[in-house]
């Protein structure tokens, strides 16, 4: 079955411009065209767009998705390649979690030192943030 760009957009929950953008980036292949120039997309493109959206939901950037699709598209790709890619993403997420925990601790500390009845120019939160 083939889909025009509007049908593909509706089916995948994206807009037409997103599809064109992904084409320019090479995330999805350039589609066949009708004699009148309409783009006609395959079910394979539908599956690929669903994959891209799911990866974005999991926190992958378009650059990371492009690299991942490069692994998927290689004929000689092995499951180990996906495993290695996943390990790198897990390590990246763990670093981000540690950074967020550090920021949370700092903000909790600032919140505890904030007397609510002081004027803004005496606020320890602002004083601390301006010093660093």
UniProtKB/Swiss-Prot annotation:
GO molecular function annotations of the record: DNA binding; DNA-binding transcription factor activity; mercury ion binding
GO aspect biological process, one term: response to mercury ion
Keywords, ordered alphabetically: Activator, DNA-binding, Mercuric resistance, Mercury, Metal-binding, Repressor, Transcription, Transcription regulation, Transposable element
A Pfam family annotated for this UniProt entry: MerR_1
Outcome (variant: residue 79 to A/H): Loss of mercury binding
Outcome, altering residue 114 to A: Loss of mercury binding
Listed PANTHER family: MERR-FAMILY TRANSCRIPTIONAL REGULATOR, REDOX-CYCLING DRUG-SENSING TRANSCRIPTIONAL ACTIVATOR SOXR
Entry function: Mediates the mercuric-dependent induction of mercury resistance operon. In the absence of mercury MerR represses transcription by binding tightly to the mer operator region; when mercury is present the dimeric complex binds a single ion and becomes a potent transcriptional activator, while remaining bound to the mer site.
Subunit comment: Homodimer.
Protein name: Mercuric resistance operon regulatory protein
Species of provenance: Bacillus cereus
Encoding gene per record: merR1
């Amino acid at each position: 079955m083939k889909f025009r760009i509007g049908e593909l957009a509706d089916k995948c929950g994206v807009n037409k411009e997103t599809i064109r953008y992904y084409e320019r980036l090479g995330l999805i292949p350039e589609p066949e065209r009708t004699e009148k120039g309409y783009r006609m997309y395959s079910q394979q493109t539908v599956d690929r767009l669903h994959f891209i959206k799911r990866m974005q939901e999991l926190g992958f950037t378009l650059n990371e998705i492009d690299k991942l699709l490069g692994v998927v598209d290689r004929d000689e790709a092995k499951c180990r390649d996906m495993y290695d890619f996943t390990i790198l993403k897990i390590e990246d997420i763990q670093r981000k979690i540690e950074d967020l925990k550090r920021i949370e601790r700092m903000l909790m500390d600032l919140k505890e030192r904030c007397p609510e009845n002081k004027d803004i120019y005496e606020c320890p939160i602002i004083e601390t943030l301006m010093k660093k």
